[in-house]
């Protein structure tokens, strides 16, 4: 599933290429995404000009004069851009697949600048929701989210004040979108390794110095990933069809039985399952 850095990369790419463009028409090949696309979807977006593109957590938001379009990529959703006159650009690829199957191209947005924005989703867990309001505060999907991890609000004091009496391990807490929004399995694994914290450590047992480390390293790993173009494990591509490269810098994620990357550590990377998710940690330096 694309996480915060991947959605941020897509947002920046889209902003450069399609912001201020007008949607000429919308073609829908398959309405059956996570939430069925309504019959009024194309009509509501035709002739609307994109005034801004923003991100909150793992959601992408297209802003129009009096409307909003909320997008979530689910497990395998991708947005691609092609030039209307050059269909060859369309032949991009998945990370582990040389062919992007056009049967999974579900929505085509034809734009006034000669570009076509395509939504491709193999598993169809992603969705688009249209709102007749320009106010983000009216979007129910966003109202219950915790602060953005890269924001000033997500700091040591916030962390300390919001873990009191919580009977959760640190891995599950960081995955809770009501506590902090946008984090997913990859970056939580990496941030906990960088902080020398075992993923099963109970929140109420965290010392202030450990909280400081976790807060700092969450921000660090996210910024680093954004600078590297995001992570491409299986499905993520940016809008140009290019893979991110942060996966080359993973310390623990997907590294089961590898030696710890810390030179001074003789531990091995172990894999356990926490709340149904694969979790990776060093057996020695994350105790």
PLM segments and residue spans:
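Phosphate/anion-contacting hairpin/loop surfaces
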Residues: 65-182, 187-194, 202, 209
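A cross-family signal for N-terminal binding/gating loops and helix N-caps
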Residues: 1-120, 125-126, 258, 262, ...
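Basic, nucleic-acid-binding surfaces and adjacent catalytic neighborhoods in DNA/RNA-processing proteins
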Residues: 15, 22-41, 51, 61, ...
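Catalytic cores of large soluble enzymes that bind and process phosphate-bearing ligands
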Residues: 2, 6, 151, 210
